[in-house]
Amino acid sequence: MSKPFKLNSAFKPSGDQPEAIRRLEEGLEDGLAHQTLLGVTGSGKTFTIANVIADLQRPTMVLAPNKTLAAQLYGEMKEFFPENAVEYFVSYYDYYQPEAYVPSSDTFIEKDASVNEHIEQMRLSATKAMLERRDVVVVASVSAIYGLGDPDLYLKMMLHLTVGMIIDQRAILRRLAELQYTRNDQAFQRGTFRVRGEVIDIFPAESDDIALRVELFDEEVERLSLFDPLTGQIVSTIPRFTIYPKTHYVTPRERIVQAMEEIKEELAARRKVLLENNKLLEEQRLTQRTQFDLEMMNELGYCSGIENYSRFLSGRGPGEPPPTLFDYLPADGLLVVDESHVTIPQIGGMYRGDRARKETLVEYGFRLPSALDNRPLKFEEFEALAPQTIYVSATPGNYELEKSGGDVVDQVVRPTGLLDPIIEVRPVATQVDDLLSEIRQRAAINERVLVTTLTKRMAEDLTEYLEEHGERVRYLHSDIDTVERMEIIRDLRLGEFDVLVGINLLREGLDMPEVSLVAILDADKEGFLRSERSLIQTIGRAARNVNGKAILYGDKITPSMAKAIGETERRREKQQKYNEEHGITPQGLNKKVVDILALGQNIAKTKAKGRGKSRPIVEPDNVPMDMSPKALQQKIHELEGLMMQHAQNLEFEEAAQIRDQLHQLRELFIAAS
């Protein structure tokens, strides 16, 4: 099923890219465990990594710091590798309230979560691809370090069907039930099966648009075929097929029985400890809750909150790391940590927050001590599990630099010839009036301005002041969610307004080629928002414009300012020298504004077929770009119901049309999530 990685791009590596690709590949072939790619904004870091993957033909996991950036990377990788398995693995919760107890008010908060089934399907598709194929790129968020079903148990539970095999129909149905598939002869949807005589139709949990038909002759599998679950049209006949479990957390019956005995032993030991400490209420609470879970597991094979018993179900010892997505990555896999200066500290912080909450639950009798082993990886465990790693950032952190031994692969020269912004330092006393005059100059030539302040109050006051003086200005603050933030950036690029004011505008990921000026107020106030890395990231926001300029307002030059200015000048000098040697004139980027929400596949608007009676239900332009993930999901559910209705009425053309629209809505949903 695997194919070789085949890179699809109209461009050839240029600028610093060929040298960066060569050095990274040499390092990987020499067995270097850690390498750092220092790639400036707009230098084509993703393209460089795609070339490395294609040349070395190794399965790869790309870690991104948030869902927005993960969606963007997923789209870019899908464009680079249209014929290979590019997968998406992020948290499938639209909403998640973990189980918690507040001793001060004696308040227990039940776990409450809303699972998004489309992302769940993509997660299952990702692990399936990692187990079956070599040509796989999985773009993941920090969700990858959280506990997942054990791959060994997951593989044991798979159902293999081949043409000619002897198997009883009841045995197939029993195995499907063990895989947590449900029988539904009326509504055929993902994770269900239906039976019609000697024909079993199965809709695999990881599939979006293909189902399996198993035709039996007595106790022999006579034919296996793949078909479109919507139209019933046969796509192809196949010699064999493997059905994967409906969830990552499925466990064989014998393992559950063994786990139940181990849970009983731990419960007895914990009860003894609680009674010795005169904690009668806690002992009663723990006994009641655990006995209920054991009865559920005995009857159904699972229970609510079964992840708290994951240590017993996976057969691991106390304190051992939980199975995660890293266990599915082959031994020769490659890990790429994007925006590593943000992602690495995130990985380090996940374990501690989770531990503090669970210790309270254990202490007050809501959970057994083994629940502490249902956790994300500790940082040391992540380091031990990580394969050969490439850290990618414009401002690598101390950790990455230390691990790479100071040998950093530079990617400073942009293929477009664009230079890093010119930097000026101006006094604080006149910063607001000076800024106003700069804004007017830029607005007159249809260019945009970003302004970053130190406090929320100052950002609000500055926005008000600029509005009073007739400037078109918006203020970006922490209460704005991802979708609205993307909408504001889109409006800035379209010229709905000229100035965007914020406190922390160095958010990695989305780029704005129209921005020609970045103004940093109070740049001489040393601290988190004015550190060397923050300054370089913020200055980089103007690096995609030919007239890029950054003004730092400060009465003195701090060590962070000096380092940021020095690094920017070093890059600019190298870029200028390269341009002169190769006769390159810097070219501005004409990136389409719609690209902000693009996810790799250009979904063509569905055209009416036949006699032109049918028309698309959801044209792209009719979908508000600021729809929340919840609203998008509701729209998707409505259309799915309508699609099934058309299919039942044998109106397959209309149903197929809605299906195409659903593809587009799901792409939008991933971006919004």
UniProtKB/Swiss-Prot annotation:
Species this chain originates from: Escherichia fergusonii (strain ATCC 35469 / DSM 13698 / CCUG 18766 / IAM 14443 / JCM 21226 / LMG 7866 / NBRC 102419 / NCTC 12128 / CDC 0568-73)
Assembly description: Forms a heterotetramer with UvrA during the search for lesions. Interacts with UvrC in an incision complex.
Occurrences of domain Helicase C-terminal (ranges): 431-597
Domain Helicase ATP-binding span(s) in chain numbering: 26-183
Domain remark text: The beta-hairpin motif is involved in DNA binding.
Location(s), subcellular: Cytoplasm
Protein name: UvrABC system protein B
Residue span(s) of domain UVR: 633-668
Keyword Hydrolase belongs to the record: yes
Record keyword DNA damage present: yes
Residues where ATP binds: 39-46
Function text: The UvrABC repair system catalyzes the recognition and processing of DNA lesions. A damage recognition complex composed of 2 UvrA and 2 UvrB subunits scans DNA for abnormalities. Upon binding of the UvrA(2)B(2) complex to a putative damaged site, the DNA wraps around one UvrB monomer. DNA wrap is dependent on ATP binding by UvrB and probably causes local melting of the DNA helix, facilitating insertion of UvrB beta-hairpin between the DNA strands. Then UvrB probes one DNA strand for the presence of a lesion.
HAMAP family: UvrB (MF_00204)
